[in-house]
A protein has these predicted regions:
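Hydrophobic beta-strand scaffold residues
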Residues: 82-83, 164, 196
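Short gly/ser/thr-rich secondary-structure transition/capping motifs
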Residues: 78-86, 145-148, 209-213
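A transmembrane-helix-recognition feature enriched in membrane-embedded lipid enzymes
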Residues: 9-84
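Hydrophobic/aromatic ligand-binding patch that stacks against planar heteroaromatic rings
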Residues: 111-112, 136, 156, 187-191
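Soluble, non-transmembrane catalytic domains of enzymes that act on hydrophobic metabolites at membranes
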Residues: 1-15, 71, 78, 83-86, ...
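A cross-family acyltransferase "interaction/gating" segment
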Residues: 130-134, 176-243, 276
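Residue-level preference for the first positions of well-ordered beta-strands
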Residues: 96-98, 161-167
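Catalytic core of membrane glycerolipid acyltransferases/transacylases, capturing the structured
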Residues: 43-66, 78, 93-146
Length: 279
C-alpha cells in the first residue's frame, strides 16, 4: 500500500506509520502558520520594546529558539520525534563560534535554532519565498547578500558573542549520494578570526523530511531520532598565514572529514536506531 525507498525496511506497523505521517504533516502546518504569526504579529511588538537593531535581533532570536523548543517538546510527547544532546549545556552556552552541521532533514534548522538561542543563521535565499519568510527575512542572513556585507554582518555578530550557524552542504543531503561542502563557513571563520564548531546530526533515517520525499511518508519502522554530537573544534589560528582560499579549503576539508568520520563511528556503535541518516 505504502512504498518506501529501497534502502529502508518494509513498514512494520501500518497504524503507527499513518499516525506518525499525519503527525508530521500537522507539525509542518503548525510551523508554517506559527512562522507567519511570529513574523507579522510578534516581531513588531518585540521591535517596539527594543532599543536598537541588534537588541531586536537578540530578543527575536531567543524568542524563536524558545518557540522551537516548545514545538520539539510537543513532537516528543506525541511520539513523533526523540532527541538526544549529550552536551546540551556546552552547545547552548557557546559564544563567538561558526557552528556547522550536516543536513539530513527539514527539521535540522528548527532543532539547531532551539539548541543554540544566540545563533544567527545563513539560509538559502529561496526560503524567503516560503511561509518561513516572516522569520527569515527579519532576523537571519540570506546567502544572496553581497559577500562583503554578509561577511561584515557575520563578523559583527561573532564579535558580539553570538554564533553563526551554517549547513555547509547548502541543502538537505540526498538519499543516495552526497552534496559538495561549500567553503562559505570556512571563509567566514577565517575572515572573523573565530573557531569552527562541527556538529554531527546522527540518528535514524529521516524519510519523510528529506529532499523530494512524499508529504505522506515517514520512517517505516521507528520514530524520528536525532542525536546531536559535538565534534572537536577547528581552530582558525592553525591556518593563520595561509592565503584565504587555501585556508578555507583546508578548513572545509577538515569539517567534512570530521563529520564523515563521526558518521562511520556512529553507525558502528549506535544501538538506538534500526536505520541511519545518509551523510
Amino acid at each position: 500500500m505504502f512504498k518506501t525507498p529501497s534502502n529502508l525496511p518494509k513498514i512494520n506497523n501500518t497504524f503507527m506509520y499513518c499516525y506518525r505521517s499525519l503527525g508530521k504533516i500537522a507539525a509542518i502546518l503548525y510551523i508554517v502558520l506559527g512562522s507567519m504569526v511570529i513574523g507579522f504579529l510578534i516581531f513588531p511588538v518585540i521591535r517596539l520594546f527594543s532599543k536598537e537593531k541588534n537588541d531586536f535581533f537578540v530578543k527575536a532570536r531567543r524568542y524563536v529558539s524558545n518557540v522551537f523548543k516548545r514545538f520539539l517538546f510537543m513532537l516528543k510527547i506525541t511520539g513523533i520525534v526523540e532527541m538526544r544532546v549529550p552536551e546540551m549545556e556546552r552547545l547552548s552556552s557557546m559564544k563567538g563560534k561558526v557552528i556547522v552541521a550536516n543536513h539530513p532533514s527539514l527539521l535540522d534548522f528548527v532543532c539547531m535554532t532551539a539548541l543554540v538561542p544566540n545563533a544567527n543563521c545563513i539560509v538559502r535565499a529561496n526560503l524567503t519565498r516560503t511561509p518561513f519568510v516572516g522569520i527569515i527575512s527579519q532576523i537571519y542572513i540570506t546567502n544572496d547578500e553581497n559577500y562583503d556585507d554578509l561577511f561584515k554582518a557575520c563578523k559583527e555578530d561573532l564579535d558580539n558573542g553570538n554564533n553563526v550557524l551554517i549547513f555547509p552542504e547548502g541543502t538537505r543531503t540526498p538519499r543516495f549520494k552526497r552534496n559538495v561542502y561549500q567553503k562559505g563557513a570556512a571563509r567566514i571563520a577565517v575572515y572573523a578570526g573565530c573557531d569552527v564548531q562541527p556538529v554531527f546530526i546522527g540518528g535514524c533515517d529521516k524519510y519523510g523530511l528529506g529532499k523530494h520525499d512524499p508529504l505522506f511518508s515517514f520512517n517505516p519502522v521507528e520514530k524520528y531520532f536525532y542525536d546531536f554530537i559535538l565534534l572537536p573544534e577547528i581552530k582558525s589560528s592553525d591556518y593563520a598565514g595561509m592565503p584565504t582560499p587555501a585556508a578555507a579549503k583546508r578548513i572545509t576539508d577538515k569539517i567534512e572529514e570530521e563529520i564523515l568520520s563521526a558518521n562511520a563511528e556512529y553507525r558502528k556503535n549506535c544501538r538506538n536506531c534500526r536505520t541511519f541518516n545518509n551523510v
